[in-house]
């Protein structure tokens, strides 16, 4: 191989990397592995990818660079042979409620085009195919106007489009038209006055073709006008009754012969819920509406109205408040008793309380000195909060009202986001919303089995080829269970990453360096093989893949492995071993090699816990693909929830169980609309539910392991009790870098100063006043055992454990951090530099320190994300310690090392999406392994 066939990195020192030198073969599948925090991401993303991105951005103009964000040069001497780099990380970046799987993959765009080309409109009422009207039928429709009506015949040429439209207006003027109707106003073209339209606003323009008085003699004139209007309006003509304002729309394109349903021109924008042309006008294309929620307005049905059952009248009941007097008049008019519990009211009474009177009511409003008689319809509590929410200009009032509102499925489009015209168009009996509601696998099957005429096949061959190609890529990366209308913001990090991966495969780029972050996360072993084939395919077409990965199957399928370590943090950052799987196994100091060879492994427990004997039982769980499911959680055990991707694991635990227990603990069952189960039993056995994720332990660089675990409070207490500190009157707050007093004010306790570079990325330099120590000179003079507070923050957990050996409270907290494998991290290390696995273990350590009641339920969703097999062994020790204290731990997991260590498994399936949502097996890992239809059981047999 020549020099250009390799990527050469020299002197990489980003984060904990120790002057790394490395040569990687190009056009290969390269795996970066090592313990959590060893420096894998620092090398792959922060060095190689960032340098590739920086070189690309630097090639652009300074004007373009300001829109792309700053790119600082990684701390590396040189990188040679670098190709254009694309990063695909585990991040859900689409927070827009309008983004769906279909839109982010652009598959929905192809579907819109397909429906615009070969879709057939059907009348939603009569279910018959819609055909265009002839001129004769249009004239017959016009004659239905009253005799001698003054009519304007209009030809729509622009509908809700941005722009000045100057060229069109000038063209129409030269063609002899005298008037236009612009945004519902008649404008003369005969005047010399120029028509100026705002280019940033949407406009509608109709040509005034003719103005006539309707009678028998005008039929010929009407016919000629209609012909002209249809020509310019592309098959659409509007007829307006000047006196009544009534407008009839006729189409030579599409209209129901049995009714008044008219189809606009079928084009791609009709099927977009982001376009005013296609969106449901009621919910503006969101599919949901914010409306008053009766369960929030009346949270306690056992109270009467007089006792304050209705929250918005809670403080004004029986007062002189005008709104209360109006509402009381409503109650009196219908004879509703305000002194009985709300639950005892009839349904008709509740409807009146919700939506008010249908007719006008006579009532009297009393003030301190006067009485006023009024007659009007009185609104109900739901109407009231919705009106106030829309009318108020006060953000405070709007926030207060929003407490009593929830998102409900739009009652007009039923959540489809589209208007009735878009939903009327069908292919093979399905409209675009119905096809988007199918799983990707089903959409693929529908696409390749379309029943088309020769003409339709000819005009859609390339379109269907592109559509099925993109769908097949999503199937290949294990996302066949997703639906196209799934909200993008609801995707897990692994799902979002694999969607971007599928998009890149579809681009067919070659000569690219892809950097991926654990693409196997969230994938069942059953689906992992397809993912590996996809990665190999990307390599085969001429790309280099650097994949940060811990999955053994992926490592064994790779061409080259880089093992980084030997441990984590300051004890990592070096290349331990590189080469083939065999090369890694042969290396005596490679921890990865020991696990690959089987020398080290996470052993299967010799026995399973029997638990406390108590259970939580949920009956009738229904959410997403889970329908009327009954299940139980045995307490005092380590429980694993398993199943193929999309089988319903997260739905069952995060959306059903967690929701039910949180409301049960809070005794809050007011959100009946969100109640996705029929019954829950055993709540008395749980007094606390804790979800532990891999999210950062703090949002700012100021947060660190010492502050999160409250360890820093104890350390500051120790320093405040030093004799010198007492003599100076220093309190505990003096040793905080977050508040004025003891911190360095030049850098505000950051230790570094940001310098704005405008078109270049911002530069951070060490504060020259405190030399990066964060504190002022007076504070640093206070020493405990010859160390300042800054020196202590710079210690690793292991060093601090020896330093504070005689301080029991501090020692216990440090020992717990050491026990979970975090002895290498520094006490003052910024939380933003911790990996997901490290952040999770800091959280677990803080919970280990708390006294157990035996009634705590811990829930973890894929806790092994980012963890090496050695890290998994540490995680298992921590989780087992929590269970040994009498608490219950539930993990949603695919990792077999974790699954085989569980006491009890709940395996869902058999497939994903609509093919999942059922409990396939429950019991110990040994019992599940015997269930033939369990995919998890099939793989468990190999490791038990």
UniProtKB/Swiss-Prot annotation:
Which residues form the C4-type zinc fingers? 256-283, 744-770
Q: What InterPro entries does the annotation carry?
A: AAA+_ATPase, ABC_transporter-like_ATP-bd, ABC_transporter-like_CS, ATP_grasp_subdomain_1, P-loop_NTPase, UvrA, UvrA_DNA-bd, UvrA_inter
| All residue ranges annotated as the ABC transporter domain in the record | 1-242, 359-597, 610-935
Sample GO molecular function, one term:
ATP binding
Q: What does the entry list as the binding residues for ATP 2?
A: 643-650
The source's superkingdom equals Bacteria
The record ties this protein, via SMART domains, to:
AAA
Residues binding ATP 1: 34-41
Where is the protein localized?
Cytoplasm
Its Gene Ontology biological processes?
nucleotide-excision repair; SOS response
Q: Which Pfam families match?
A: UvrA_DNA-bind, UvrA_inter
Any one Gene Ontology cellular component term annotated for this protein: cytoplasm
Instruction: Tell me the keywords, alphabetical order.
Output: ATP-binding, Cytoplasm, DNA damage, DNA excision, DNA repair, DNA-binding, Excision nuclease, Metal-binding, Nucleotide-binding, Repeat, SOS response, Zinc, Zinc-finger
Protein family membership = Belongs to the ABC transporter superfamily. UvrA family.
Subunit-structure text = Forms a heterotetramer with UvrB during the search for lesions.
- What does the function comment of this entry state? The UvrABC repair system catalyzes the recognition and processing of DNA lesions. UvrA is an ATPase and a DNA-binding protein. A damage recognition complex composed of 2 UvrA and 2 UvrB subunits scans DNA for abnormalities. When the presence of a lesion has been verified by UvrB, the UvrA molecules dissociate.
What is the recorded name of this protein? UvrABC system protein A
Q: Which organism is it from?
A: Mycoplasmopsis pulmonis (strain UAB CTIP) (Mycoplasma pulmonis)
Taxonomy, top ranks, is: Bacteria, Bacillati, Mycoplasmatota, Mycoplasmoidales, Metamycoplasmataceae
Write the gene name: uvrA
């Amino acid at each position: 191989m020549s020099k250009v066939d390799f990527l050469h990195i020299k002197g990489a020192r980003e984060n904990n990397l120790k002057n790394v030198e490395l040569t990687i073969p190009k056009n290969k599948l390269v795996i970066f592995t090592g313990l959590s925090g060893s420096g894998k991401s620092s090398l792959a993303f922060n060095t190689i990818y960032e340098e590739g991105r920086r070189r690309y951005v630097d090639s652009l103009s300074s004007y373009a660079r300001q829109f792309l964000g700053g790119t600082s040069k990684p701390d590396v001497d040189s990188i040679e042979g670098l190709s254009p780099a694309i990063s695909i990380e585990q991040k859900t970046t689409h927070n827009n409620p309008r983004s769906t799987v279909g839109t982010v993959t652009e598959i929905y765009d192809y579907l819109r085009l397909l429906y615009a080309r070969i879709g057939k409109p059907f009348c939603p009422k009569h279910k018959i195919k819609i055909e265009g009207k002839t001129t004769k039928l249009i004239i017959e429709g016009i004659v239905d106007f009253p005799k001698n009506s003054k009519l304007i015949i209009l030809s729509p040429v622009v509908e809700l489009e941005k722009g000045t439209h100057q060229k069109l207006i000038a063209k129409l003027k030269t063609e002899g038209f005298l008037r236009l109707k612009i945004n519902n106003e008649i404008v003369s073209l005969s005047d010399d006055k120029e028509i100026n339209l705002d280019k940033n606003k949407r406009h509608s323009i109709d040509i005034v073709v003719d103005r006539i008085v309707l009678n028998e003699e005008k039929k010929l004139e009407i016919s000629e006008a209609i012909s002209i209007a249809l020509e310019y309006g592309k098959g659409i003509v509007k007829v307006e009754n000047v006196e009544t304002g009534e407008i009839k729309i006729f189409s030579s394109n599409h209209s129901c012969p049995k009714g008044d349903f008219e189809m606009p021109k079928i084009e791609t924008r009709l099927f977009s819920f982001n376009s005013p042309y296609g969106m449901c006008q009621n919910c503006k294309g969101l599919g949901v509406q914010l409306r008053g929620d009766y369960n929030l307005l009346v949270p306690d049905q056992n109270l009467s109205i007089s006792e304050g059952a209705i929250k918005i009248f809670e403080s004004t009941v029986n007062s002189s408040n005008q709104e209360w007097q109006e509402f009381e008049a409503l109650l009196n008019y219908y004879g509703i008793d305000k002194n009985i519990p709300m639950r005892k009211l009839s349904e008709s009474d509740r409807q009146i309380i919700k939506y008010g009177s249908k007719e006008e009511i006579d009532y009297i409003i009393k003030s301190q000195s006067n009485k006023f008689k009024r007659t009007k319809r009185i609104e109900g509590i739901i109407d009231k909060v919705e009106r106030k929410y829309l009318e108020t200009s006060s953000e405070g009032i709007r926030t207060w009202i929003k407490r009593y509102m929830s998102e409900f499925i739009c009652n007009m489009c039923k959540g489809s986001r589209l208007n009735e015209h878009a939903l009327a168009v069908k292919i093979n009996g399905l409209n675009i919303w119905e096809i988007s509601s199918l799983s990707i696998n089903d959409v693929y099957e529908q696409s390749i089995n379309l029943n088309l005429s020769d003409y339709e096949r000819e005009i859609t061959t390339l379109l269907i080829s592109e559509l099925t190609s993109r769908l097949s890529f999503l199937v290949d990366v294990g996302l066949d269970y997703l639906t196209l209308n799934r909200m993008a913001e609801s995707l897990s990090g692994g799902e979002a990453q694999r969607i971007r991966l599928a998009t890149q495969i579809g681009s067919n780029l070659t000569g690219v360096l892809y950097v991926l972050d654990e693409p196997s996360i969230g994938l069942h072993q059953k689906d992992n093989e397809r993912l590996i084939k996809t990665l190999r395919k990307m390599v085969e077409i001429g790309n280099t893949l650097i994949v940060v990965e811990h999955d053994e199957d992926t490592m064994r399928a790779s061409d080259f492995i880089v093992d980084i370590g030997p441990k984590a943090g300051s004890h990592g950052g070096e290349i331990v071993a590189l080469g083939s799987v065999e090369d890694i196994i042969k290396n005596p100091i490679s921890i990865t090699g020991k696990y690959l060879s089987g020398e080290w492994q996470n052993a299967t427990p010799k026995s399973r816990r029997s638990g406390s004997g108590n259970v939580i039982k949920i009956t009738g769980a229904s959410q997403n693909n889970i329908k009327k499911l009954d299940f139980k959680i045995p307490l005092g055990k380590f429980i694993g929830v398993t199943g193929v991707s999309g089988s319903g694991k997260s739905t069952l635990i995060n959306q059903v169980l967690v929701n039910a227990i949180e409301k049960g603990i809070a005794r809050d069952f007011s959100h009946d609309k969100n109640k996705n189960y029929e019954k829950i039993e055993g709540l008395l056995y749980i007094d606390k539910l804790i979800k532990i994720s891999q999210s950062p332990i703090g949002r700012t660089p100021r947060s660190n392991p010492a502050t999160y675990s409250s360890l820093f409070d104890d350390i500051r207490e120790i320093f405040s009790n030093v004799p010198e500190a007492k003599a100076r009157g220093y309190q505990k707050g003096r040793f905080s870098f977050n508040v004025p007093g003891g911190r360095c004010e030049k850098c505000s306790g950051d230790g570094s100063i940001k310098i704005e570079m405008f078109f270049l990325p911002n530069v951070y330099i060490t504060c020259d006043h405190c030399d990066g120590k964060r504190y002022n000179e007076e504070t640093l003079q206070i020493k405990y055992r010859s160390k300042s507070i800054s020196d202590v923050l710079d210690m690793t957990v292991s060093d601090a454990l020896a330093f504070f050996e005689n301080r029991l409270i501090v020692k216990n907290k440090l020992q717990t951090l050491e026990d979970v494998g975090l002895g290498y991290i520094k006490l003052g290390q910024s939380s933003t530099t911790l990996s997901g696995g490290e952040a999770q273990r800091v959280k677990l350590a803080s919970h280990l320190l708390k006294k157990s009641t035996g009634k705590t339920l811990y829930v973890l969703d894929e806790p092994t994300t980012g963890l090496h097999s050695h890290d998994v062994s540490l995680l298992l020790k921590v989780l087992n310690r929590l269970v040994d204290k009498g608490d219950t731990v539930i993990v949603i997991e695919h990792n077999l090392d974790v699954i085989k260590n569980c006491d009890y498994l709940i395996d869902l399936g058999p497939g994903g999406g609509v093919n999942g949502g059922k409990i396939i097996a429950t019991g110990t890992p040994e019992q599940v392994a015997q269930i033939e239809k369990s995919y998890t059981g099939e793989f468990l047999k190999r490791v038990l």
